[in-house]
Regions:
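ABC ATP-binding cassette signature C-motif
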Residues: 1-208
Length: 208
């Protein structure tokens, strides 16, 4: 297992229902998990419990030695909006040549004139693409993706899907995008009132 929770509970003051209620969860290499549930059930909080940004109230969280987590936030907080796309990647991966960086950006649909533009002047979709590319270029083995297809057009979604299909680590994603979940996941975790119910297969299998 990359990460394991035993008897994990989490509740915020002022909320009637817990985020987790005495749950046993594990994520292993090859797992591709889609987290679904109603608004306010705590799907993003569950991602933060996996990263350790939020801490469980009781139970245990064990991260395997050598586990490295990459986290895609909806607000693109990993980006420096003053820098252009090439510089963002250069800082992350100084081992990559300019040609390799341009090829990676080209795969994520960055045209020549876009790669030199500071991110502050790019659209939400363009920022999303660079944030996703950066996470895929990191040396991680567990990817957490919070609504990764928001702001993406169909071409960009297909590019992301191809990249995630090639990715060798585990993936956990919160998404309302049924098409994306059908392409990517092999498990659905339904979060409701602190209980995680696991279904094997993709989103279409889950709703059957």
């Amino acid at each position: 297992d990359i990460i394991q929770f035993l008897g994990a509970s989490k509740k915020f003051e002022g909320l009637k229902r817990p985020i987790l209620d005495n749950q046993d969860l594990e994520i292993s290499k090859g797992d591709r998990i889609g987290i679904v549930g109603g608004n306010g059930q705590g799907k993003t909080t569950l991602l933060k419990l996996i990263t350790g940004d939020e801490v469980i109230d009781s139970g245990s969280r064990d991260l395997a030695p050598g586990a490295i987590i990459g986290y895609y936030h909806q607000d693109h907080r990993t980006l420096d909006f003053k820098l252009n796309a090439v510089k963002q990647v250069e800082l992350l991966r100084p081992d990559m040549s300019y040609g390799e960086i341009r090829a990676a950006l080209g795969r994520f649909q960055f045209a020549k004139e876009q790669v030199d533009t500071p991110l502050g002047k790019l659209s939400g979709g363009e920022r999303a693409r660079i944030a996703l590319l950066k996470i895929l270029l990191e040396e991680n083995n567990l990817l957490l993706l919070d609504e990764p297809t928001n702001h993406l057009d169909m071409d960009a979604k297909e590019t992301l899907e191809e990249a995630l299909t090639e990715y060798e680590g585990a993936i956990v994603t919160v998404s309302h995008d049924r098409w994306f979940l059908d392409q990517i996941v092999n498990q659905i975790w339904e979060l409701q009132d602190g209980i995680v119910t696991k279904y094997y297969g993709n989103y279409t299998d889950y709703i059957r």
